[in-house]
Amino acid sequence: MASVLDPVCRHAAATPDNIALRGGADQWTYRQLRDTSVRYAGALAAAGLSPGDRVLLAAPSVPEFVVAYLGIQAAGCVVVPVNTMSTRAEAEYVLGDAGCALAIAWHALGHAVAEAAATLNVPSWTLSPGATVTGAAHAPVVDRDRDETAAILYTSGTTGRPKGAQLTVGNLLSAGEIGAECSSGSSADRTGTGLPLFHVFGQASVMMATLTVGGSMSLLARFDPASMLEMLRRDRLTIMAGVPTMWNAMLHVAGDADPADFAGLRVAVSGGASLPGEIARAFEARFGCTILEGYGLTETTAFGTFNDIDRGGKTGYTGRAVPRLQVQVRDIDGNECPPGTVGEVHIKGPTVMRGYWNRPADTAAVISPDGWFRTGDLGATDTDGDLRIVDRIKDLIIRGGYNVYPGEVEAVLYEHPDIIEAAVIGVPDDHYGEEVAALVAARPGSELGAAEVSSWTRERLSAYKVPRIIRFVDALPKGPSGKILKRSIDRTELTRAPRSATYPRCGTEHPPTGEMCPPQK
């Protein structure tokens, strides 16, 4: 029997005055975090909630999110964190699908959650600064089996309606232990992030890992590169966690910042999307730390592989399986692929979700009877066992019978000094089935044009991988974690767009599907 609150209770007893949370000028000790969380649990129990009841939580990355989250856990209830930008319809869907008994929303948010709750006759609370609740009293922490559901995180819903991934007590506790081990974390560490805690990366890799070792966690309610840089200086961070777009943004505001301001920073943990080598090298050089990339999903409580902190990162790779997990790359027949061969990534271990909420068929489609989870991601290992994520299976572009992995093309685009954001997608094409399209955000003041982008990629990629459609944008759409959202890109206009270059077929040397030659001179 266990509770997600256990690490906090342990440190509150051993080192009660150590700082657990920082949010701007606010600080919370481990004693304060435990006591306030337990009082919050008492208020939930007094309101009639029972263990197993689902509670929706909508709040930014503020200390009060952590209090409410842990209070829900201490009461034995199931937390259902949602995006703070959720519309009324989106909140209503989650409330109904999860069968929530209560909705809690941060005081500064709009009325979407409260209105959705009222529509379904679900009571709603306001989460106020300090996480004060009326009629609150200390209540005993409810222990549960490690395989009981502790949280339901709804996936992004790239196809169909979002599905709720059930993360168990054991999943979350294991994630905290694994995350702490991967970063060699200790109670002396000061971790900072601009990630949303309602996302699995912030929740499992950062929050749970920090609380597991008794370190402190500094939070930004909303990521801003200048604010993140100031937090790094002010709180003397030793660990940062974020996604590639955050590192890129910080590089652009670092300017002539004094390296002494971040002399204590030892590691930056990167995830959520592939980390371009150019960004990794530039960040390490500017901030004097090691940047380590990991790989995981909501359904694996954020963990799968991670670059070993003792041997450093390997550019383009997300490392080996983390402790206690197994990772395999398998072919279409389910056989393990040899090094260098692309296949689907499978993960097994204590962080694999219990299943999708009320969706047994969807669960059976991704979790085998012996516990292996099909990620839907394409990857390959090298001879050292390090994993390279190639792309999502659904993002694969098949142009004239040839596989084009968007991530490979994006990596080449990011090498260009004037490109700060890039996304490569496939669009329907009458001749080749799909055509390669690149959306590019250039550095302010740059005179970069499509011809130069085309030339840059032609020099570095096989002809069939070169984008024939190139569009410039001010910025690419991003999700709450900062990850670029390809599903939000309007493909309609791109489908009608003229191709920027044409390439003759290769005569008798091309296969039936039509290999492409380099341009004729």
Protein language model features and the residues they cover:
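ANL superfamily adenylate-forming
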Residues: A25, A108-D147, R161-P162, V253-A254, ...
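Conserved AMP-binding A3 loop
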Residues: T29-R31, A150-S174
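Conserved ATP/PPi-binding loop(s) of AMP-dependent carboxylate-activating enzymes
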Residues: R320-R324, N335-V366, V404
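Conserved AMP-binding/adenylate-forming core of the ANL superfamily
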Residues: D17-V62, V66-L70, T87-E92
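Gly/Ser/Thr-rich phosphate-binding loop
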Residues: L237-G242, H252-G313, Q326
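AMP-binding/adenylate-forming catalytic core of the ANL superfamily
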Residues: S86, A103, K348-G349, R354-G355, ...
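Conserved AMP-binding/adenylation subdomain of ANL enzymes
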Residues: L173-R190, F198-I239, V253-A254
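Conserved pre-ATP/AMP-binding loop-to-beta segment of ANL
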Residues: D17, A137-Y154, R161, S184-R190
